Swiss-Prot record:
Major localisation: cytoplasm
Protein name (database record): Acyl carrier protein
GO cellular component labels: cytosol; membrane
Function recorded in the entry: Carrier of the growing fatty acid chain in fatty acid biosynthesis.
Localization per Swiss-Prot or TrEMBL: Cytoplasm
Length: 77
């Protein structure tokens, strides 16, 4: 797993309180990891802070899974 993926996973585990094993590439933040809409906003803000990037609202709406987050961040850094 890449450094970016490791850092994203750490943020997801910390913010959602889920086991690392549940955070897979296709794991949906809402459907699989129990996040609500506020959690997803907080995740996006945490990703922005961790990686020093800005995620526009329209892009944030497309980040539904762990894999989506990693791909977006890899393209933004």
């Amino acid at each position: 797993m890449s450094d970016i993926a490791d850092r994203v996973k750490k943020i997801v585990v910390e913010h959602l309180g889920v086991d690392e094993e549940k955070v897979t590439e296709t794991a949906s933040f809402i459907d699989d990891l129990g996040a609500d809409s506020l959690d997803t906003v907080e995740l996006v803000m945490a990703f922005e802070e961790e990686f020093g990037i800005e995620i526009p609202d329209d892009a944030a709406e497309t980040i539904q899974t762990f894999g989506d987050a990693v791909k977006f961040i890899q393209g933004a850094v």
